[in-house]
Curated annotation (Swiss-Prot):
Region (Disordered): 46-132, 656-688
Biased segments, Low complexity type: 663-688
Residue intervals passing through the bilayer: 624-644
Coiled-coil annotated residue ranges, if any: 538-575
Organism listed in the record: Mus musculus
Name of the protein: Myelin regulatory factor-like protein
DNA-binding region location: 108-400
CC terms in the record's Gene Ontology section: membrane
GO MF, one annotated term: DNA binding
Family: Belongs to the MRF family.
Gene for this chain: Myrfl
Keywords: Coiled coil, DNA-binding, Membrane, Transmembrane, Transmembrane helix
InterPro entries, alphabetized: MRF-like, MYRF_C2, MYRF_ICA, NDT80_DNA-bd_dom, NDT80_DNA-bd_dom_sf, p53-like_TF_DNA-bd_sf, S74_ICA
Membrane topology recorded in Swiss-Prot or TrEMBL: Single-pass membrane protein
Amino acid sequence: MDVLGENEALQQFFEAQGASGTLENPALDTSLLEEFLGNDFDLGALQRQLPDTPPYSASDPRSPPQVKGACCRTPRPPAGRIPAAFLHSTTAPGPLPEHPSQSMAGQTHSSFQNGYPESSHPATCRHQTGPSRLGTSCSFHQQPLCHVPGSSLPPTKKRKHSQIQEDSWDCSSWAHYFRPMTTRSQSIEVQDHDREGRNGMPVDQCSPALKWQPYQSVPWHSLLNSRYEKLPEVGYQVVTDKGFTFSPVDEAFVCQKKNHFQITVHIQVWGSPKFVKTQVGLKPIEKFYLKAFGIKVEATNQVIAIEQSQADRSKKTFDPVKIDLLTDQVTKVTLGRLHFSETTANNMRKKGKPNPDQRYFMLVVGLYAANQDQFYLLAAHISERIIVRASNPGQFENDSDALWQRGQVPESIVCHGRVGINTDTPDEALVVCGNMKVMGTVMHPSDSRVKENIQEVDTNEQLRRIAQMRIVQYDYKPEFASAMGINTAHQTGMIAQEVQEILPRAVREVGDVTGGNGETLENFLMVDKDQIFMENVGAVKQLCKLTNNLEERIEELEIWNKKLARLKRLSSSWKSSISEASSISKLSRAVSASSARRTGSKKPTKVSFSGRKQSCPNWVFQTLVVVLIAVMAFCALTIVALYILSLKDQDRRSPNLPLSNMTSSPEPALSSTAPTSAPHTTPETTQTSLQVPEITFCEILPCQETYCCPVWGPRILFSSPAQRQLEAEREIHQRQWAEDKSKSFLTSSALISPDWESDWIDTTIASIQIVEIQQMIDRRYCSRMLHCGPGHYNYNIPVNKNTPTNVKFSLEINTTEPLIVFQCKYTLGNICFRSQRERTQSDGEDAQMTQGYQHIWRLPVARFSDSAYHFRVAAPDLADCSTDPFFAGIFFTDYFFYFYRRCN
């Protein structure tokens, strides 16, 4: 029929729709229809732009037929570009396109809102009542959509379309089948939208979504650009929006034939495709089409046609849909109101159970490139198996009697199969996604009659493995915790990958697990904590063995300690034994002389014979005594000589203190002792004081004022009670140490035997420093008047007169072995604060201690004119402040520090 004018065209259009009289509606904007009729269009384009939901359906929203990037409007194709084989009938009415101004304003016209509701703006997955909506909202958590900035749909007053989510697409999902091509900025965008999408409903609270996988019935064709360069494979993903429900009994998705279903296809093209590579060469691309059809599982060559509901509730064969693919963008195409043209075979149940001869369909959605009515497959996806029934699928879900039965024991229920709680894919007899409370005990079979190959394990290896395991604190990801029903996200445990390297049999792969954001974790790992528990039992047994060995060794050490004490007592009685031996020899001489006289007076006839007979034993005895005394004297001289040589050798030997700060100048001759009987001694000389560096804070603090020095003259040595008490204590220790040292040579060979050398502990200090100024205390501070060598070290440390009284002194003592440092005694001299009493002496013997390699002591040096401290560095459990000084240099080493302000 010829169209003479726009008014006649409008009249015929509305008569075909059965909407005569709507032109009289004052709310109708005819400019939109006039613009539409004024342009060229074809019926195929109208058919492609049909609404997704017929006007009579109030429960299903309409979605746009095609979304580029983020639900953009589909541009009108030029006329005459769709093959005749795919054109719809001319009687099929087409929808009117949206006016640009109307889309921007977000307004609707009353005459069209009942027939063709506008597409809503993007909405997130919301929890809604009704089983159909529940499954739909779940699928979009599993297959999110990538948002393209700058594109959005206008808001509307209609019900929001929950199947469109431009702000939650995960671009990384393409990488499962295709090479990733997203840029850096796109990746950041995806993460932001993923976090927004996690606020939705957990996956396990929804029905499972229909899964898709690549399908290649024929080889896929490659795309080339204008320079004949091969482009990467097309990113292609199919998402099921609605229309399918999962039947646990049938273990398949079920679709009702009279109810329509809807799918959404996401397409990503990299570059600008211009040619398609075929078997006969390169062909220019004219159009891109989407085609959907079904196939039978048992016979994949048999195609099942797909139908689409029209606006007048009639069904027509679904023809390929022409689409426009933009360069380097995600194109979203929604195919709605689809039906299978026939049902599957053998749908009826047998005695309430699924039919063993049940037949299935599979849905295929492919992307084609067209050239002169020839179609070339670019990508295709195929769904899981589907059951298509003519009646409501809910009528078939009466499966409680088939799964659960009463047991033989009273009040018991039996399930012959796998049970899943909060999960629809149980792979064990019972799988619980969430917390579980067990008030009783969990029993395991352990009867020896059902075991074989019983072998004793190596507890040493179990201890080694347990020592390698790392215990960590962690938080489950929110989407995973919500999907698996984990209420307490923060937990303490192990990492399965780390345990797998140490104890592989304690880790199991349970297959693929889908998280709350749709991310699939391949070969998910779980830990068998029972195996780790048994490893702990073996490790504890090994620790018990080690503890017993240590106890035995401690007992042996105690025995050696008793032997050492006995040797000490023997050495103390050695001198008395020597004197007794000399007296016995003298007594024997006198006795022999008197006996000779008596025998001579009684028997004069045998004087010569008996005299020779008695004189020989006396001479031999006297000779032996003289030789013995000479040998003992020689031994004593040898011991004294060795002792003197050892003392000289020890003086020449430097202690284990750092000598990095020592200069080439001779050792300072700091006089730290003087006779206590002299009331006053001469002050220190200037030369001596300059050779020892002072403890000064002038590098970090201003040195302008003098603290804690008398105004009437220079400081006199040893006028402080701290110095006098320290010197008295030092002299006592020196005398005891010297006496014990002379005795120790008798037992030194027993103490330092090859058996003890391996366990000998070095109790000397590796380094000493003032922490605040990093000042090392070394041999330069050693006292010249007192012993400063193995066993006892005496240090005289001058403090600069400009040192404030409120600075902190931290003495750091470093050892090469883990030792214990005791502060056995301290003595404080004159206090520097003028507001308090001028002279205060305080001392203490409350022993304090530190352990380890590094020992830091806070000392009140700056607040006093002088102070003295006695530290004892001892081996653990072998010495303390009350240990006999005899063991100095063996079990402990004494250190005396005397700090004084140098005021001259």
